[in-house]
Amino acid sequence: QRQMCIRDRPALVFGVAFGNLLQGVPFELNELSQATYTGSFFALLNPFALLCGVLSLAMLVTHGANWLQMKTTAALRDRARAITQIGALVTLITFVLAGVWLSFKDGYVVTSVIDHFAASAPASGKQVAVEAGAWFKNFNENPALWAFPALVVVGALLNVVASKANRCGFAFLFSVLTMAGVIITAAVSMFPFVMPSSTHPEQSLLMWDATSSQLTLNLMFYLVLVFVTISLLYTTWSYYKMFGRLDESFVEDNKNSLY
């Protein structure tokens, strides 16, 4: 139980971190664009951020339980099905609550013209306004984007239905769609912000002024070509070796290759 608690912490922290991004992080930049965090650790553990942490934890626990449904049998599979159904509903409820809460909270919007081809200069050159409900601006201007939060609602409900019907493959697919909807919804809400500053909004990091140098980007590109390829090959091999349900007979027959 202690190991499970420790392993759950990254999922919780991930949501807490994104919850703080949506509220703005207290930091400032000097003339060299070096950032200084001006807040406290405990200020990061605010109610909205903790709600986002619960959302992240529920979402990832649900996805893990969906995977267990496909890989296990008997009592363990039944427990995974129960966790899936509860987790999917918790994910849906916390997602809706966070959305409603966010509609009343201050968001950030760029009010000046941005030169997308200019050199990165996050410390100056833009104007940012703080407005209530600003994170819904992209959705209101492009109604088609509401498809992403709708995907969360539909995906979570269908996850429960598929799990109850013992259709584990479909349940896993709906869990994937739910996670994609949550992540894309948050990204669309913040666009083009990467990290807004709550103390100096004009120094917020945007997509166009938070980039690295051309040399670093080129180096990262070639490294990604190599190491992502290796990761994909290893992951494909791992899934091939672990294909099928795990039960006592499977473990006994493959005791040399599974460990």
PLM features per residue range, with description:
Residues 7-17, 88-108, 173-189:
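Hydrophobic alpha-helical membrane-insertion segments
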Residues 40-91:
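Loop-centered beta-sheet repeat module
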Residues 82-89, 136-146, 208-226:
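Membrane-interface transmembrane-helix boundary segments in multi-pass integral membrane proteins
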Residues 106-141:
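Membrane-interface interhelical connector segments
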Residues 18-34, 101-119, 191-200:
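Membrane-helix interface motif
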Residues 125-130, 197-217:
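Short, membrane-exposed interhelical loops at transmembrane-helix boundaries
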